Amino acid sequence: MKIDITSVNGETAGSIDLDDAIFGLEPRVDLIARMIRYQLAKRRAGTHQSLGRADIHRTGKKMYKQKGTGSARHGSARAPQFRGGGKAFGPVARSHEHDLPKKIRALALKHALSAKAKDGGIIIWNDAKIPEAKTKGLKANFEKIGLTNALIIDGAELETNFSLAARNIPQIDVLPVQGINVYDIVRRDKLVLTTAAINALEARFK
């Protein structure tokens, strides 16, 4: 797949051939969905907790005698049916993380990249560098080239001026290539890759 290379300012800077084994697959939505579910499950804090019957600080003495009152039989006031009693089958603090094979995770990333390429949502930059760390100027530049909702992936190390200028722009995410992930690719309209990121991805999946 051949695609044009542009600069941060939108000027043409050549073209590049993208590897079809990474960017030319027929996207499988099921793999992408599994990977997103895996990512979001890992992010959950899992700190939800309610008081169960055993956690309630209340006397365990029988409420009233078994027979002779005309009322239903009851033992502990900690039971769920009483006001102030414990929650039956309530949430407990736990990890929501689940396993997903490494090969499936790698394949899901390829399919997410292929889906973005198929939709015409990939932009290739020669680099992500600017002379000074000015958010106002970078935001105006993005608006000029129509980049309002994007994930920008650079090489192994981000250029300091660019990352500082971009980090306060809404709906613009900047990550090094090792941080590329399916969820962030899908949640943004455009995926911007520098040539350094392309080379790193092709080396990673070789």
Swiss-Prot record:
Residues 63-85 are annotated as: Disordered. One of its GO terms (cellular component) is ribonucleoprotein complex. InterPro entries: Ribosomal_uL4 (IPR002136), Ribosomal_uL4-like (IPR013005), Ribosomal_uL4_dom_sf (IPR023574). NCBIfam families: rplD_bact. PANTHER family: 50S RIBOSOMAL PROTEIN L4, LARGE RIBOSOMAL SUBUNIT PROTEIN UL4M. Belongs to the universal ribosomal protein uL4 family. This is Large ribosomal subunit protein uL4. It comes from Beijerinckia indica subsp. indica (strain ATCC 9039 / DSM 1715 / NCIMB 8712).
